[in-house]
């Protein structure tokens, strides 16, 4: 068999570059994103890797090693484990009518721009929780859409979300507009808040100059105590409000909140593919505003949800627009944050509309997930709309457009009817178990000997590269590092990945296979 020719004609199906995994630094092992040989001078740390190529090339290499010896080598490569923490945190809900500056205030409280801010009402449509830290105390800050008692349609749903936030918070911050004064909606909301069984803090926002002190007097008529003059845009007065929030928190929150414990799931896909409907089906409540208009969800919406087997932290994203560069304003920031959501997630559920052809948008989101090295489950939603002709077309699309991810679990669901939703959790658990999984160095090198014996590496530059040794450098995603005497072609790395999956499985997670070229040393330890 002409191994070199067979691999030379093979197309590149899946990128192995794009080191988006934050736990892995390719430069630590002397190779770059394209797996090029390391021609740089070795530093002092390379003294730990003085390999005798003749020993490593022996057929029985490593067979007499104990697991302790393998583990010692792995520790020298800096493999780390990440712990998951649990803690109970209080929640403060930021409420008020539309366009009084709630999201700007949230960004001040959390010290970063996460809540979408635009100078027109209705940008925030869901209630979204952000983690904040003030004076050494951590707590949740919950942003809400604008509340209005007389609205209909999607705006009524937004108002309902604000009411749900008020019902679950430990402290409520009621935001009014100093420049506008008290409106009828403010008065109605104040009467509602006076009946709340938790502390309410009145914040008069847009207090931009001392000349507005006279305007503060009217807010006492709301009956909610002294108003705090604040300019969220300029950062004025926010510290006093945060101090008051901490002072008002109860000793124990209403409900236990888990910060690091649940595994993080990103629900991603193009707009109107059913992400919010799926989240609501899992949560059993109206957690995310749903409407037939594409792009209803603007902010990422986090929900802690108990499914059959585990607690999960679901993140419902805004969906990617056709081209980020053509998006404007709040949609531009929401699209950028979708990328950030993928980076911060552990497993991504990619929702694809099964009733429509797979689009370039679907492919682009998929590429973002695999480049980020995240565990993956592909869910084909709206299966209740499928007919036989469309199923035949979809089978052809899968063969052509998703052939590079045969390792990803595919599930046909309907968020509307609940079809097959019970299959999603086992698929996510399996994907995460493999994403976290590490193969012992002994098992890895036993497999490697067999794979190379069956198909040796192709010639390169008239020389046959020799694979000396392999180790799994990290997890999340699994990264296999091969120490060799020469560069390995991309086709041969794909062959090794296929053989690796045949032996060890690893369904649901991408695998990185990297090459560390060991230069031959002459007498005196100098490179040749």
Curated annotation (Swiss-Prot):
Residues 1-62 are annotated as: Disordered. Pfam families: KH_dom-like, MMR_HSR1. One of its GO terms (molecular function) is GTP binding. One of its GO terms (biological process) is ribosome biogenesis. Belongs to the TRAFAC class TrmE-Era-EngA-EngB-Septin-like GTPase superfamily. EngA (Der) GTPase family. GTPase that plays an essential role in the late steps of ribosome biogenesis. Residues 1-12, 30-62 have a biased composition (Acidic residues). GTP 1 binds at residues 96-103, 143-147, 205-208. Residues 90-253, 263-436 form the EngA-type G domain. Associates with the 50S ribosomal subunit. GTP 2 binds at residues 269-276, 316-320, 381-384. Keywords: GTP-binding, Nucleotide-binding, Repeat, Ribosome biogenesis. This is GTPase Der. InterPro entries: G_ENGA, GTP-bd, GTPase_Der, KH_dom-like, KH_dom-like_a/b, P-loop_NTPase, Small_GTP-bd. Residues 437-519 form the KH-like domain. PANTHER family: GTPASE DER.
């Amino acid at each position: 068999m002409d191994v070199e020719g067979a691999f030379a004609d093979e197309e590149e199906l899946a990128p192995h570059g794009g080191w988006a995994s934050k736990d892995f630094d390719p430069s630590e092992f002397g190779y770059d994103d394209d797996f090029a040989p390391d021609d740089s001078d070795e530093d002092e740390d390379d003294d730990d890797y003085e390999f005798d190529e003749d020993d490593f090339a022996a057929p029985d290499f490593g067979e007499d090693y104990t697991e302790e010896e393998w583990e010692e080598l792995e520790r020298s490569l800096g493999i780390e484990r990440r712990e998951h923490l649990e803690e109970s945190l209080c929640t403060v809900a930021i409420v008020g009518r539309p366009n009084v500056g709630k999201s700007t205030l949230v960004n001040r409280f959390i010290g970063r721009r996460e809540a979408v801010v635009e100078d027109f009402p209705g940008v925030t449509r869901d209630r979204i929780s952000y983690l904040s830290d003030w004076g050494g105390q951590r707590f949740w800050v919950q942003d809400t859409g604008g509340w209005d008692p007389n609205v209909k349609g999607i705006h009524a749903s937004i108002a309902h979300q604000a009411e749900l936030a008020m019902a679950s918070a430990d402290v409520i911050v009621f935001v009014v507009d100093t420049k506008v004064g008290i409106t009828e909606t403010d008065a109605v909301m104040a009467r509602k808040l006076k009946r709340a069984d938790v502390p309410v803090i009145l914040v008069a926002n847009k207090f931009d100059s001392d000349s507005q002190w006279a305007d503060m007097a009217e807010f006492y008529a709301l009956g909610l105590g002294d108003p705090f003059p604040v300019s969220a845009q300029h950062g004025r007065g926010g510290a006093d409000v945060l101090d008051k929030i901490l002072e008002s928190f109860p000793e124990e929150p209403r409900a236990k909140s888990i910060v690091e414990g649940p595994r993080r799931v990103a629900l991603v896909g193009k707009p109107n593919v059913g992400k919010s409907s799926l989240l609501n089906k899992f949560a059993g409540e109206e957690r995310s505003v749903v409407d037939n208009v594409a792009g209803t969800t603007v902010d990422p919406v986090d929900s802690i949800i108990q499914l059959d087997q585990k607690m999960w932290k679901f993140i419902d994203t805004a969906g990617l627009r056709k081209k980020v560069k053509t998006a404007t304003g709040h949609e531009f920031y929401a699209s950028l944050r979708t990328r950030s959501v993928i980076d911060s997630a552990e497993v991504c559920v990619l929702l694809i509309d099964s009733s429509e052809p797979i689009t370039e948008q679907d492919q682009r989101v998929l590429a973002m997930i695999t480049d980020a090295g995240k565990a993956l489950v592909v869910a084909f939603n709206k299966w209740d709309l499928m007919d036989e002709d469309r199923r035949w077309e979809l089978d052809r699309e899968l063969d052509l457009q998703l052939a590079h991810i045969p390792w990803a679990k595919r599930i046909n669901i309907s968020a509307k009817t609940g079809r097959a939703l019970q299959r999603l959790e086992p698929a996510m658990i399996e994907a995460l178990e493999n994403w976290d999984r590490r193969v012992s160095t002994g098992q890895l090198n036993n497999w490697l000997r067999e794979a190379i014996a069956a198909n040796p590496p192709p010639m390169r530059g008239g020389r046959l590269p020799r694979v000396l040794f392999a180790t799994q450098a990290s997890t999340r995603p699994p990264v296999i590092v091969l120490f060799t005497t020469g560069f390995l072609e991309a086709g041969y790395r794909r062959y090794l990945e296929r053989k690796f999956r045949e032996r060890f499985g690893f369904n649901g997670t991408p695998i990185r296979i990297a090459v560390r070229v060991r230069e031959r040393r002459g007498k005196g330890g100098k490179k040749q």
